[in-house]
Amino acid sequence: MGFRGVFILLSVSMITMYSCVLGRDTAKSGISEINFGSGGGVTGRVVMYRLRPNGTVYNDNNELVTKLTKKETAHLFGKLSKYADYSYDNPSNMSCFIVITSKRKENRIVWAVMGDPHIDSEVVELYERFMSKIDTK
């Protein structure tokens, strides 16, 4: 099973597991959560973090990793709300992804880790901004 298969399986599992605990949509953005992650390569390992509207960040084991400030959370939710319908699916051996979930749909944005010239640069900047807030030790 390739990265795409693992990613789809992981996404479906996460949605199923957390569907009962999803909070209300953020009033301004309409987004209920944002997942940021990367994976692939020889091992196929996928690392994912889930950002909730209250700023809490959980890893894929549902362990609390950190809590972002209200300002940072509002910035990420606000900026990423305009990408709720952005279509980009270009995985490679190693890929990054953002999954934007709202009441009405889920949108996956997937791009190559090693510089994808066609992805909207703001998406990559927002991904990097979020990941810089995570203590990955």
What are these regions, as identified by a protein language model?
Residues 1-20:
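Sec-dependent bacterial lipoprotein signal peptides
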Residues 20-39, 71-72, 83-137:
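Short, well-ordered, aromatic-rich surface patches in folded extracellular/luminal domains
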Residues 37-59:
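N-terminal secretory signal peptides
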Residues 46-48, 65, 108-109:
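Well-ordered beta-strand positions in beta-sheet-rich domains
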Residues 55-62, 105-111:
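Short, well-ordered strand-loop elements centered on a beta-strand within folded domains, enriched
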Residues 57-87:
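A short-motif feature that recognizes glycine-rich, charge-decorated loops
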